[in-house]
Amino acid sequence: MIVVVDCKDSFVYNLVEYISLFDKVRVVEKESAGLLRKMSFDGVVISPGPGKPDRSLEFVFKMGVPVLGVCLGHQMIAEVFGGKVGRVEPVHGKTSLVEHDGRGIFKGVRNPLRAGRYHSLAVLEPPEGFEVCAKSEDGVVMGLRRGKIHGVQFHPESVLTEDGVRMIRNFVEMCHDG
């Protein structure tokens, strides 16, 4: 089972639908995320949402399961691990070409990838120990990875993103590969 932490974005249930193609999924609101401490699951997706990243979900990264952060979730990863998140030129409902390394969630995904973006904040400095695994054509960090922790600034669940279902399937497979 994959848990989606709902950070109140309108795309949350697109993520849920994609995940449900490959595994059971449960949605837990961010305000109730403490419930995860008592649950059994194979992976966590931290959803997009409005506002600024914070450290409220820091405990999730210590649970030993794969984590995928999307947009705000990606920014939370950077925030929790000491990276820097800040304002960038707003990009809402636009596509960009994203170059990636073809590993992890990007395995088997076309390169460059056309990805849907909806953000005005981004990772300006990645956390130490994380690799930048994807960047947009305008130089914005679009993917971070360290071990079982993965983040993407763009929205794989958007219809604007090519191979979004493939990326989610790759993540679910990682959750079951140990």
Swiss-Prot record:
Its EC number is 4.1.3.27. L-glutamine binds at G49, P50, G51, Q75, S120, L121. It catalyses: chorismate + L-glutamine = anthranilate + pyruvate + L-glutamate + H(+). SUPFAM superfamilies: Class I glutamine amidotransferase-like. Pathway: Amino-acid biosynthesis; L-tryptophan biosynthesis; L-tryptophan from chorismate: step 1/5. It holds the Pfam family GATase. Keywords: Amino-acid biosynthesis, Aromatic amino acid biosynthesis, Glutamine amidotransferase, Lyase, Tryptophan biosynthesis. It is an enzyme of class 4 (lyase). One of its GO terms (biological process) is L-tryptophan biosynthetic process. CDD domains: GATase1_Anthranilate_Synthase. InterPro entries: Anth_synth/Amidotransfase, Class_I_gatase-like, GATASE, TrpG/PapA_dom. It comes from the Archaea. GO terms for molecular function: anthranilate synthase activity. Residues 1-178 form the Glutamine amidotransferase type-1 domain. GO terms for cellular component: cytosol. The active site is at C71, H155, E157. Heterotetramer consisting of two non-identical subunits: a beta subunit (TrpG) and a large alpha subunit (TrpE). Part of a heterotetrameric complex that catalyzes the two-step biosynthesis of anthranilate, an intermediate in the biosynthesis of L-tryptophan. In the first step, the glutamine-binding beta subunit (TrpG) of anthranilate synthase (AS) provides the glutamine amidotransferase activity which generates ammonia as a substrate that, along with chorismate, is used in the second step, catalyzed by the large alpha subunit of AS (TrpE) to produce anthranilate. In the absence of TrpG, TrpE can synthesize anthranilate directly from chorismate and high concentrations of ammonia. PANTHER family: MULTIFUNCTIONAL TRYPTOPHAN BIOSYNTHESIS PROTEIN, MULTIFUNCTIONAL TRYPTOPHAN BIOSYNTHESIS PROTEIN-RELATED. This is Anthranilate synthase component 2. It comes from Archaeoglobus fulgidus (strain ATCC 49558 / DSM 4304 / JCM 9628 / NBRC 100126 / VC-16).
